[in-house]
A protein has these predicted regions:
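Terminal amphipathic alpha-helical/low-complexity segments used for targeting or macromolecular assembly
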Residues: 1-102
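Structural signal for interior beta-strand "rungs" in well-ordered beta-sheet cores
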Residues: 99, 103-197
Length: 199
């Protein structure tokens, strides 16, 4: 899947110290394409494979490069501004976009670009980081956090205040993985590298 794209990302990451403004500009279309793949669910930082999980390190590399191609900027809405490099996932959404998404997004939710939100998911006021995957029918309850690149399966309940750890570096580190049909209790913290098996 996306072998040419992967090769370009790998090459850019291996030579990241030498990337100048022109090189970063030239790389932006590939990085935006990766973000779109993550948001659509067509690519995942970690995916089930042969009874286990495979980490796609090149997607983590793309996320790290994505940070480099953005300057800090004011975002959000009047009266509630943010100062960040990563755009909000839903900042340009209208009613039709939300209908297509098929998830419920309650006021107070912060989801960053590059996060996947499955059909019939419910996001109470919570935080979903870049590269995270929230499966279909999953509820992320109030003040819960799904960290960068964390993978949450379908029909899960991430209870109020729970933290699902995120990890971008080291690249080979496995993100936190919550498989399908799991209940994570209130105020629980599931840290990087932990896999909670299917419920």
């Amino acid at each position: 899947m996306n072998t040419e794209l992967q090769a370009r990302i790998e090459h850019a990451f291996d030579n990241r110290a030498a990337l100048d403004v022109a090189a970063i500009e030239a790389l932006k279309p590939d990085l935006y394409h990766v973000i779109a793949l993550l948001e659509s669910g067509d690519a995942r930082v970690a995916e089930p494979q042969d009874g286990g999980w495979k980490v796609n390190e090149w997607l983590k590399k793309a996320v790290l490069l994505y940070f480099r191609c953005h300057d800090m900027d004011v975002m959000g809405e009047p009266g509630n501004p943010f100062w960040d490099k990563v755009p909000l996932r839903f900042e340009n959404y209208d009613a039709e976009d939300f209908r297509r998404l098929g998830a419920r997004v309650v006021p107070g939710t912060v989801a960053r670009a590059g996060s996947y939100i499955g059909k019939d998911a419910v996001l109470m006021p919570s935080f979903i980081n870049i590269g995270a995957h929230v499966g279909a029918g999953t509820m992320v309850d109030t003040w819960a956090t799904v960290g960068s690149c964390a993978q949450v399966g379908a029909r899960c309940h991430i209870s109020g205040g729970a933290g699902i750890g995120g990890v971008l570096e080291p690249l080979q580190a496995s993100p936190t993985i919550i498989e399908d049909n799991c209940f994570i209790g209130a105020r629980s913290e599931v840290v990087e590298g932990v896999i909670v098996g299917e419920g």
